[in-house]
Amino acid sequence: MEKNFALVDLHLHLDGSLSLDSVKELAALQDIEIPDNDKELLEKLQVREGCRDLNEYLEKFDFPCSLMQTPVGINTAVRNLEAELAAQGLIYAEIRFAPQLHLQKGMNQSEVVAAAVKGMGQSTLKSTLILCCMRGKDNHEANLETIRVAKEFLGKGVGAVDLAGAEALFPTADFEDLFVLAKELGIPYTIHAGEADGPESVYKALEFGAKRIGHGVRSLEDGALIQRLAAEGITLELCPTSNLNTSMFESYEVYPLRKLMEAAVKVTVNTDNMTVSNTTVAEELKHLALSKEEMHLMAKNAVEASFTDAETKEWLKEEVEKRFL
């Protein structure tokens, strides 16, 4: 990785990206007992080799979530993550999390987001929050509340909403009303689709009006869908190591990034969960053996698709070009 090259991460989950140091600080701040050796601690945070699927992968989120149930826990986690991303050379990141998963100690969703916003902007990193609705069967009201809270903070730290969780168990088709509301309120959105479920999930996300798709790699199972993604300029938020972790692909060599590029689909390279998958954006780009020109294209695509304001987007575009020269 060339020094000072512009790095961007559009698909980064807060709860899956708490570093070991951050976890220790959060535990100490809140008097929470955690394993006293790093090996045991990492076992609670990182996915094991031989992970079966996305559902097993998602089990790694309960422990870090338990450390972010207070205002100080959340704003410290965001502050630390932004500092770590800046140190890695990122110029911009979109950090996503589900406010409804942080209510165990009395906060409401608005208070959760306010705490996260308080942790932003304390490093050189430019950032935006994406609030995740969660796939499930008993949380419809909580999801609607997430949309309403996103509107409350839109342009004040929050840039968009998302739908995350166990895609194969809770199909995208079941969540249309969330995006009807988001559209009515003028909130941009991305949708996790085409990861654990097939092309039909991506078709539904497009039907709901999504201009960005989280993962989306199973779109390759449907040639007509690939043509549509290219024609409509839909951006895919690819997360290679995460997809290898969940047994979607056997190796980076067969990961379909270039196949998608050859089909004129806009793609970006992201981490998904830095700690769960033990990765960084720089490592993702290295694994894929991208040329300097290809890395430049990934950064340009990411900035163009970002959920930030026009002024920040222009600054990011200039920074990407300046660092490419």
Residue ranges with predicted function:
Residues 189-191:
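Conserved hydrophobic beta-strand within the GNAT/NAT acetyltransferase core sheet
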